[in-house]
Amino acid sequence: MRKDIHPEYHKINAVCACGNEVELGSVETEMKVEICSACHPFFTGKQKLIDTAGRIEKFKQRYAKHFEKKAEA
């Protein structure tokens, strides 16, 4: 391998939005994540709705007329 062309690899703490920290190796200096294994519904067994910026409501408003027409027909 050629010298002095590879990024520096070091240990960092990845911080989740729930506050959980995981130590891992990366070329980045810091890492922030929204969901980790401590708060993800698959790993916790708890169902929780994660709706960023009202996407579900926007979808329902956009397609409400379409679904009403199919129900009437």
Swiss-Prot record:
One of its GO terms (cellular component) is ribonucleoprotein complex. GO terms for molecular function: metal ion binding; rRNA binding; structural constituent of ribosome. The keyword Magnesium does not apply. Disulfide bonds: none annotated. Gene3D superfamilies: Ribosomal protein L31 (4.10.830.30). Keywords: Metal-binding, Ribonucleoprotein, Ribosomal protein, RNA-binding, rRNA-binding, Zinc. InterPro entries: Ribosomal_bL28/bL31-like_sf (IPR034704), Ribosomal_bL31 (IPR002150), Ribosomal_bL31_A (IPR027491), Ribosomal_bL31_sf (IPR042105). Its cofactor is Zn(2+). Binds the 23S rRNA. Belongs to the bacterial ribosomal protein bL31 family. Type A subfamily. This is Large ribosomal subunit protein bL31. The gene is rpmE.
